[in-house]
Regions:
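Nucleotide-activated sugar donor-binding and catalytic core shared by glycosyltransferases
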Residues: 1-417
Length: 417
């Protein structure tokens, strides 16, 4: 049944590629993947393979990737993506020797891929459970790890009808999971090669904080204002919520980095901002931005550094399929607000428990919270400190994973020499 689904998926992608530019990029990338590998794989090298579905998973795997590269430079790194949103942004990533798409998980593709690369170790980040790739890796005795994975009772592996597919989990040498609940769930189906290490994203946001970009244009916009609200990865429902409040609160400067940067959406934001002076990052100079009330970040790659300039952050997605990365904001020591769809996001729940994060579901709740931040500086600073402390406390997952896999990496080095 699984293989039938994979072949149907392959056919579906081929058909959808005719009508959807994003799917077309994925299809072409997968078709080109074997050519890339044939040209670039060094037959004498030993490859450690990292697979990430998209950009978020890449950021989770990145600290470990870079730690292995730093401590074991003799290994080469292969990085694969499933989604164009990951590959297109990171196809030139210098921390990997080869970056490409992962061909769809058919038996033929998996055999050909692994025969070409011959990895000595493999890491799948978070939710990646491709049966054919994993089965062949296991059959070949390749140490294979699931990193920053998290499991919930409703997943197919833990339902009676999903036990057969759950066998894919036995192909992993070890799971490095985010929490104790995940460990207990795996144990309930007889999988005990599990270590609770936490989430490598905490390590990643600390790394980003240390090498933040200097943004003179944003600094000029902020000036000497002590009330700067930064909205990151926002969608229209998020923007409608907070812009209704700020329409009558001119004491706050706004920086908006929308998740979708298309002219149609930017026009919607501008429509909501009638009466305010609006500047777009790519169209402004330090002179023109100084008098603006709102700065729209209309390009990618700046958000993690932009948060540095805020006093209060809002992370979008909570009125849709789910919130985006709250840790990118929290690491800068500021209270983080987000919408109600956050229950399956452990980091958001932890931030709420630490009193550094706040769920808002309507205009009244948002206004009440922002009014308090405006009038009570002590409350704002206390919330900010708790957000930063929450992130600092939960770092270290990367080092724990590295120490666990280091003996295997050292053994491979000795075998080669």
């Amino acid at each position: 049944m699984y293989n039938f689904i994979m072949y149907a998926m392959q056919l579906g992608v081929r058909i959808a590629a005719r009508f959807d530019s994003k799917v077309r990029k994925m299809w072409r990338g997968e078709q080109a993947a074997f050519g890339v590998l044939q040209q670039r794989v060094d037959p004498s090298a030993r490859y450690v393979w990292f697979h990430a579905a998209s950009l978020g998973e890449f950021e989770q795997g990145r600290p470990l990737m870079e730690a292995i590269r730093r401590e074991f430079p003799d290994y080469k790194i292969l990085l694969t993506f499933f989604s164009p949103s990951g590959y297109e942004v990171r196809k030139d990533y210098k921390g990997a020797d080869i970056v490409t798409y992962l061909p769809i998980d058919t038996v033929g593709n998996a055999r050909r891929f692994l025969r070409t690369v011959r990895p000595v170790m493999a890491f799948f980040v978070k939710y990646e459970f491709w049966y054919n790739y994993l089965h062949i890796l296991n059959h070949r005795g390749v140490p294979t790890y699931s990193v920053s994975s998290i499991f919930r009772p409703g997943q197919i592996f833990f339902r009676p009808y999903g036990r057969q597919y759950g066998r894919v989990l036995r192909c992993f040498s070890r799971f490095f999971v985010q929490n104790e609940e995940s460990s207990l769930l795996l144990s309930s189906i007889g999988i005990d090669q599990v270590e609770v290490v936490g989430d490598t994203r905490f390590d990643r946001v600390l790394q980003v904080r240390e090498v933040r970009k200097q943004l003179p244009l944003v600094e000029r916009f902020v000036g000497d204002s002590h009330r700067v609200f930064v909205a990151g990865s926002s969608w229209l429902p998020d923007e409608e919520l907070f812009l209704r409040y700020f329409a009558s609160h001119p004491e706050w400067k706004l920086i908006i980095a929308p998740h979708v940067i298309k002219e149609e959406h930017l026009a919607q934001i501008s429509q909501l901002l009638q009466g305010k002076k609006v500047a777009r990052y790519t169209q402004s100079s330090e002179e023109t931005v100084a008098d603006a009330d709102v700065l729209i970040i209309d390009c990618f790659g700046l958000l993690s550094s932009v948060y540095h300039y805020g006093r209060v952050a809002y992370v979008g997605g909570g009125f849709g399929v789910g919130i985006h990365n709250v840790l990118e904001a929290a690491v800068w020591g500021m209270p983080v607000l987000f919408g109600p769809n956050n229950k399956h996001f452990q980091e958001a729940q932890g931030l709420i428990a630490a009193q550094g994060g706040f769920e808002v579901s309507d205009d009244a709740g948002f206004a009440q919270l922002m009014d308090r931040f405006t009038k009570d500086e002590a409350f704002l600073q206390e919330s900010a400190g708790r957000a930063a402390a929450f992130v600092e406390k939960l770092t270290g997952a990367t080092e724990r994973v590295l120490q666990a896999v280091k003996p295997e990496l050292e053994k491979n080095c000795q075998a080669q020499s």
